């Protein structure tokens, strides 16, 4: 329990490579999620009975070659893990035919690294402050430098930056509660969530809408409460909790457009098991 508390708020997605003496298993890869990398690699190498995965049990020893972290919560990390594992099914990755199968003579590690490289270039992941940590020098690869550009839609939003107070919902065009009315209501009673006016996390975006309108727009099948989504005006990615916090007056949310280096490549070869 203490070891988990020491790395509170750490959410990582890692890549393992098998160094099994058995040619059948050597070179196989495994992608997983963890809050404690040191504990997790030990579980994998001790087998399924010790908490390791069935797919890695008795097929090692396994080496954790890299881990991606910096996710805002476990949901975001788990979605990244799933997409990396399932490029043929992922809504974003399945549109890239070059990622649907390994190239000729490409190893499992090289294939997974190629998928990871493309994932870090696309939204929503290229807007997160992700860190890639390397643990094994022999597998270390340089990421191809490619300058990340702001989506065209985000530039269009700047033209309307002066519209700080909206009276109509951007989505349904219905009336919104004015800022002055909200302040008066706050003095008399606690606001209900349905009365909130939601605004984009991007300071230059003029989006203003009802809670229920945005929720209906970004709600995924099987969800009761939204987790994340893309702004219908500027296409900026957001976490639902951050949108609600901003509507409630929190001011510690950073504008995504200020993140000029959202992906940090941090080589750490002396960390590991």
From Swiss-Prot:
Alphabetical keyword list: DNA damage, DNA recombination, DNA repair, Endonuclease, Hydrolase, Metal-binding, Nuclease, Nucleus, Zinc, Zinc-finger
Membrane-spanning segments: none
Listed GO MF terms: 5'-flap endonuclease activity; crossover junction DNA endonuclease activity; zinc ion binding
Pfam families linked: GIY-YIG (PF01541), SLX1_C (PF21202)
GO cellular-component term (any): Slx1-Slx4 complex
InterPro entries noted in UniProt: GIY-YIG_endonuc (IPR000305), GIY-YIG_endonuc_sf (IPR035901), Slx1 (IPR027520), SLX1_C (IPR048749), SLX1_endonuclease (IPR050381), Znf_RING/FYVE/PHD (IPR013083)
Cofactor: a divalent metal cation
Top EC class for this record: hydrolase
The EC number(s) this enzyme carries: 3.1.-.-
Subcellular location as annotated: Nucleus
Biological process (GO), any one: double-strand break repair via homologous recombination
Occurrences of domain GIY-YIG (ranges): 9-96
Zinc finger boundaries on the chain: SLX1-type: 169-234
CDD domains in the record: GIY-YIG_SLX1
The keyword DNA repair appears for this protein: yes
Function: Catalytic subunit of a heterodimeric structure-specific endonuclease that resolves DNA secondary structures generated during DNA repair and recombination. Has endonuclease activity towards branched DNA substrates, introducing single-strand cuts in duplex DNA close to junctions with ss-DNA.
PANTHER family for the chain: STRUCTURE-SPECIFIC ENDONUCLEASE SUBUNIT SLX1
Subunit composition and interactions: Forms a heterodimer with a member of the SLX4 family.
Family: Belongs to the SLX1 family.
Protein name per its UniProtKB record: Structure-specific endonuclease subunit SLX1 homolog
